[in-house]
């Protein structure tokens, strides 16, 4: 991309072509890192990022969609926090990767934003890095997945429905839950087989 407009346009085009369990990507990236190199004029960047966030909210109509920011204090990150507080849109959901590199000022800005719009959530980077290594992302609440793949296995299971039809605790644990888990695993395998082997998306 040559400028901030190219950057947001390219991301929005890319999001339309990601296979997903929702109407768009589950994870839209560390958006501050993706956009910060193109923030030259802050007012122009604010305008472009506002359009970007509005487009994501209006076209990926599912709060399963998630963005990460941080840990570093960037111009793009500050603009994203400022606009999130102003716009108060539910999508994308957002997390701040928090570690020793996160400045107090940036963390406080995130807290102020969270008090207005209930995002971003704070992520203990040290804990997730211990489990996943450096190349992870937080997607859809607190699910961690490796960057570059893994969202294919995200599915939804309505546990309440299982409870509603359970005849007893034993029926739930011994029959319904194992059958539901087996169905989820089969669905994941079929999705992965189609996208990775038959559809050749990646």
Task: Please place each PLM-identified region on the residue numbering.
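Conserved catalytic cores of very large enzyme subunits
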Residues: 1-202
């Amino acid at each position: 991309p040559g400028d901030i407009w190219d950057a947001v346009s390219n991301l929005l085009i890319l999001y339309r072509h990601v296979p997903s369990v929702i109407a768009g990507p589950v994870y839209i990236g560390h958006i501050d890192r993706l956009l910060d190199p193109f923030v030259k004029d802050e007012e122009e960047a604010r305008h472009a990022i506002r359009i970007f966030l509005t487009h994501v909210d209006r076209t990926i109509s599912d709060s399963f969609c998630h963005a990460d920011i941080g840990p570093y204090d960037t111009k793009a990150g500050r603009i994203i926090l400022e606009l999130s507080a102003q716009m108060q849109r539910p999508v994308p959901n957002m997390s701040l990767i928090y570690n020793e590199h996160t400045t107090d000022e940036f963390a406080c800005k995130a807290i102020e934003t969270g008090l207005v719009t209930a995002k971003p959530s704070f992520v203990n980077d040290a804990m997730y890095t211990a489990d996943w290594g450096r190349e992870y992302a937080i997607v859809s609440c607190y699910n961690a997945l490796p960057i570059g793949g893994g969202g294919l296995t995200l599915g939804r299971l309505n546990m309440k429905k299982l409870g509603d039809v359970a005849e007893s605790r034993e029926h739930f644990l011994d029959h319904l839950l194992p059958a539901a888990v087996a169905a989820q695993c089969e669905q994941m395998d079929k999705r992965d087989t189609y996208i990775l082997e038959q559809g050749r998306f990646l």
